[in-house]
Amino acid sequence: MRKALRSLLAASMLIGAIGAGSATAEAASITAPQADIKDRILKIPGMKFVEEKPYQGYRYLVMTYRQPVDHRNPGKGTFEQRFTLLHKDTDRPTVFFTSGYNVSTNPSRSEPTRIVDGNQVSMEYRFFTPSRPQPADWSKLDIWQAASDQHRLYQALKPVYGKNWLATGGSKGGMTATYFRRFYPNDMNGTVAYVAPNDVNDKEDSAYDKFFQNVGDKACRTQLNSVQREALVRRDEIVARYEKWAKENGKTFKVVGSADKAYENVVLDLVWSFWQYHLQSDCASVPATKASTDELYKFIDDISGFDGYTDQGLERFTPYYYQAGTQLGAPTVKNPHLKGVLRYPGINQPRSYVPRDIPMTFRPGAMADVDRWVREDSRNMLFVYGQNDPWSGEPFRLGKGAAARHDYRFYAPGGNHGSNIAQLVADERAKATAEVLKWAGVAPQAVQKDEKAAKPLAPFDAKLDRVKNDKQSALRP
């Protein structure tokens, strides 16, 4: 009886947090211009204030919002999901950003936010700490639950920010923005997804093999492969250094099993990581095959990162690897040039990076469903990729009549995993910028007459628009 009463109480509290329409509407009705934006947000049930950081021309708030652990059974527990608000004006459009990982608590602005000169809501992905339910029921970490998190936060904030909304994100964040539109297609007026991989069939990854056969020039590809092999030929010497470094820095290898296994993963990432974060012009930095072990060690650490497969490096990203091994899929690349020097064939797959007490079963079909929706039913979708980014090997595909639905896919020439609209060729840059402005409802008359006139509405801000160093020290989108 006591347990039932607690469950009923929890359900009633959550229903109050969800707002059942009336509570949110009541909070939103306080729309007097003089009302403080923080006070207006805090009147929404489930909102908590964490901190505010000053930034000229904006209000920047760090908040949490109470979410159900399971959106299908909202009475079965809640957790606090962290998000930030870069507030400009309620009369401006709002961009909903997510990285698909943790949220930064320092003021920043995504490219679409600068283009439309709007507000930005940035949300932390569920299960990335501190936005993790306790205890953690990992079966509730899937793309629908995460999309439903975004949907609820959007519903809570829409009465305050009533103008048009766009969704955006890069890499896993671009995937997240796409999944959000698939499950809640009417929430956003448009979506800008950057460098978002689309692993429709996890067992068929030949597109990546083709990519690595053609990326950059032949000399660079050949030298990278040679150095990758040499790193494994000198394995024993380098692993001894690796173990010494780990001991001195308190790093352990319980999840992957040993420093030797971790090292093989690090080396397997080497070529992928080079193209993910570097350019053809950086090929001159690739050491000679006969380089000293010191040079080789430094190059491997600079490109792949020795910390990535330690327990401490993996822990933060357990939610990603769980998703990769249950729904998202993960790339598998053939490495014929490494024949005879691999000790653990097949080790570089998601199950290797998730603690064994967390059960994982791959559920095929989730990515194929999203892929079908994008090709057949999506509208107002913009996908931006980098020509030399490995994750572009399996991009989202546009179906028949894409242009009529205002769906676009552009590639930044020579671009890597940091590619954006600004790096597109002139005509595509103008088209993409014009579409974003139109979706947001703020396209100037000049742009409506001639899309070539399209440019960001907000001036560049060196701090707010700085290029983030989101480099992952392991193979992650």
From Swiss-Prot:
GO terms for molecular function: aminopeptidase activity; dipeptidyl-peptidase activity. Residues 1-27 form the signal peptide. InterPro entries: AB_hydrolase_fold (IPR029058), Peptidase_S37 (IPR008761). Residues 462-477 have a biased composition (Basic and acidic residues). Its EC number is 3.4.11.-. It comes from the Bacteria. Residues 28-33 form a propeptide. GO terms for cellular component: cell surface; extracellular region. Optimum pH is 7.0-7.5. Optimum pH is 6.0-6.5. Active between pH 4.3 and 8.3. Stable after 12 hours incubation from pH 4.0 to 9.0. One of its GO terms (biological process) is proteolysis. It is an enzyme of class 3 (hydrolase). Belongs to the peptidase S37 family. Has proline-specific tripeptidyl aminopeptidase and tetrapeptidyl aminopeptidase activity. Activity is highest against tripeptides containing an Ala-Pro motif. Involved in the final processing of transglutaminase, by removing either the tetrapeptide Phe-Arg-Ala-Pro left after TAMEP or SAM-P45 hydrolysis, or the tripeptide Arg-Ala-Pro left after SGMP II hydrolysis in a single step. This is Prolyl tri/tetrapeptidyl aminopeptidase. It comes from Streptomyces mobaraensis. The gene is ptp.
